[in-house]
Amino acid sequence: TSATNIFIAGGGKLADSIRQFDQLHAIGEEPSHWLCVRALSVTARILIDVLPEAALVDSLEEVRALIATRPSRICVFDPMPMLTGEQSQRGSTSLPRSWAVTSDSIAAHLAELLGATELALLKSNLPEAPSIQQASEEHFVDPYFPTAAAKLPLVRCVNLRSEAFEEVALKI
């Protein structure tokens, strides 16, 4: 069957720079969180340049429309509108606004809201241990990820730096 692949680009060096800035200037977790969310908008646009066949979307409605009309389409999701209140006003559970949440938890949250059958985390390595909790403890995923991913049927990690694209399913 066809599947819609929805990418959320991580914050990468932009988020790392914001974290360093916060450590130096103590701007606080919530303001830093929102700066990192803005960075995700930037990295989403960078990813669109790398994947020109992908559609840039920024709402659940756009994703659902894409799934309904073009189920095999690739899209890049800019989570900023969802996280700044667009979706939480409709009753969805919001994520903590802190360093405990990264693009991993945001992707898990989106997957849950969409009723996805699986979440694939594309990483540069694989976790040492195959459980979500242990992956969080070893900083492979963020501290909130075990909560964000708790209701997902399947979470896979794929090593993009492996020639064979090795993968492992994380146990909940």
Region spans (language model):
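Short, surface-exposed amphipathic charged segments that create phosphate/polyanion-binding patches used
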Residues: 170-172
